[in-house]
Amino acid sequence: MRASYLFTSESVSEGHPDKVCDRISDEIVDLFFREGPKAGIDPWAIRAACETLATTNKVVIAGETRGPASVTNEHIEHVVREAIKDIGYEQDGFHWKTADIEILLHPQSADIAQGVDALQPGTNQEEGAGDQGIMFGYATNETPDLMPAPIFYAHKILRLISEARHSGKEKVLGPDSKSQVTIQYENGKPVGVREIVVSHQHLVEDMTSNQVRERVEPYVREALPEGWITDKTIWHINPTGKFFIGGPDGDTGLTGRKIIVDTYGGAAPHGGGAFSGKDPTKVDRSAAYASRYLAKNIVAAGLADRCTLQLAYAIGVARPLSIYIDTHGTGKVTEDKLEKAVAEAMDLTPRGIRKHLDLNKPIYARTSSYGHFGRTPDAEGGFSWEKTDLAEALKRAI
């Protein structure tokens, strides 16, 4: 490992155009999981693959679903408008009341369903993966949430500003924003911040970059550890000078375009599959959550300081094709022992993952901004993959 280096990660807010689309797609997944049980539909039977495009006062939703007939286009449109309202868009070019919403959802392909659905009771075949693919999980002990420091603090900056905006404290700031932090590492540990970038939409057209900095700098300083910002830290606040037109009115958004922001900020590999808009039969989502869960529990158990874990699946096949672990020279036991231990400690079939992490719930909209990982598990079952309740089982399996 290099003794000294810089590493940079970025985050975007819930008002970023792509994140607006992620939020809408996940709200629709949640809608099916909320309404299914009311209509007597088994949550295990719910299917959703929902993509969203947002541009100037226009939202297009397309995809495949299976769920209750009670989920009508009118129901979906209401949920979409409420999501846009909650984010904070009431601009001429993108307004929750006036945006044209086009819904193009249709039933899931029977060819896909036949490989994904569990067969009738009494058969010896299991529910298969919803697609082929590779998924990665990662954990490191460099932050309390076992996340890489650059993405951890990039998210934290924007979360603090968002909370202030929603509280009414920062009424002049709009929903759309981005952050980026360049962290200085010494001996593999984060020790300071070299560069800070915040681009934030403002609702008063003639605000200057300096005026925006006066608003956002306190939250940046609150987010970062004491002593990390020095007189050598370089600030870039609204470096283009103006950010009045924001959100989908300024830049078209699509679901699934912020996969590095959603995960580890580039500090770990990514299998390429996006999360939002997908029910948990899609291993792009559920197996990525399981990979993070396992990597985090390995680090939490003290079995490694860093851990990268890969799972691989084939469509219609239940068991993972491979399990790969790399502890980057920090492991207290060999990687092959860890690979055997995780296979013993958790059922890694799609059904096993959904059951272990309790994923058949309306818990997805909350994941759509500020990262799917490094979050706090909540009482409703959200972020269950961030628990460290498997650490003891892994120790026993070694």
From Swiss-Prot:
Note on how the cofactor is bound: Binds 2 divalent ions per subunit. Binds 1 potassium ion per subunit.
Protein localization: Cytoplasm
Catalysed reaction, written as an equation: L-methionine + ATP + H2O = S-adenosyl-L-methionine + phosphate + diphosphate
Pfam family, one: S-AdoMet_synt_M
Keyword Nucleotide-binding applies: yes
Positions of region (Flexible loop): 108-118
Positions annotated to bind K(+): E51
Domain of life: Bacteria
Pathway: Amino-acid biosynthesis; S-adenosyl-L-methionine biosynthesis; S-adenosyl-L-methionine from L-methionine: step 1/1
EC category name: transferase
Family classification: Belongs to the AdoMet synthase family.
Function: Catalyzes the formation of S-adenosylmethionine (AdoMet) from methionine and ATP. The overall synthetic reaction is composed of two sequential steps, AdoMet formation and the subsequent tripolyphosphate hydrolysis which occurs prior to release of AdoMet from the enzyme.
Subunit and interaction comment: Homotetramer; dimer of dimers.
Protein name (record): S-adenosylmethionine synthase 2
Source organism (scientific name): Rhodopseudomonas palustris (strain BisB18)
